[in-house]
């Protein structure tokens, strides 16, 4: 029974520690389109947003957009991701 409780708590902690899948947004609040790009392009974009990886997703009919795997909601926004990487950019730290 104790093992089951430890496993359950571990799963809950891991799920809250990891992010989810989000479409990253540029500094203009637009999504990164990938109509003529590859999964490698989206992977690079997503890693800049501190995601585990990324791919080109076509969930919106004809439009294709980069989707990031395991990224926090905050880091899906361009300036939030920059502030996470460089604390000197954080407005509240000044």
UniProtKB/Swiss-Prot annotation:
Keyword terms, alphabetized: Disulfide bond, G-protein coupled receptor impairing toxin, Ion channel impairing toxin, Neurotoxin, Potassium channel impairing toxin, Secreted, Signal, Toxin, Voltage-gated potassium channel impairing toxin, Voltage-gated sodium channel impairing toxin
Q: Which GO terms describe its molecular function?
A: potassium channel regulator activity; sodium channel inhibitor activity; toxin activity
Q: Name one Pfam family in it.
A: Toxin_3
> Record's superkingdom?
Eukaryota
UniProt subcellular location: Secreted
Question: Where in this chain does the record put each LCN-type CS-alpha/beta domain?
Answer: 20-87
| Range of residues in the leader sequence | 1-19
The free-text function statement in the UniProt record for this protein reads: The homodimer inhibits HMG-CoA reductase (HMGCR) (32% of inhibition produced by 0.6 uM), a glycoprotein involved in the control of cholesterol biosynthesis. The inhibitory effects of bumarsin are seen at much lower concentrations (0.6 uM) than that for statins such as atorvastatin (5 mM) and simvastatin (10 uM). In addition to inhibition of HMG-CoA reductase, this protein lowers cholesterol levels by inducing steroid hormone synthesis via StAR, and by increasing reverse cholesterol transport mediated by the induction of ABCA1 and APOA1.
Q: Which family does it belong to?
A: Belongs to the long (3 C-C) scorpion toxin superfamily.
The protein in question is named Lipolysis-activating peptide 1-beta chain
Q: Which organism is it from?
A: Lychas mucronatus
């Amino acid at each position: 029974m104790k093992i089951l409780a430890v496993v359950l708590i571990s799963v809950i902690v891991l799920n809250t520690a990891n992010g989810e899948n989000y479409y990253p947004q540029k500094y203009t609040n637009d999504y990164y389109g990938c109509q003529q790009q590859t999964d490698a392009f989206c992977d690079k974009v997503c890693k800049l947003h501190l995601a585990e990886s990324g791919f080109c997703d076509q969930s919106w009919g004809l439009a294709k957009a980069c989707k990031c795997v395991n990224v926090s909601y905050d880091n899906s926004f361009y300036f939030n991701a920059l502030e996470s990487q460089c604390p000197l950019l954080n407005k509240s730290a000044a």
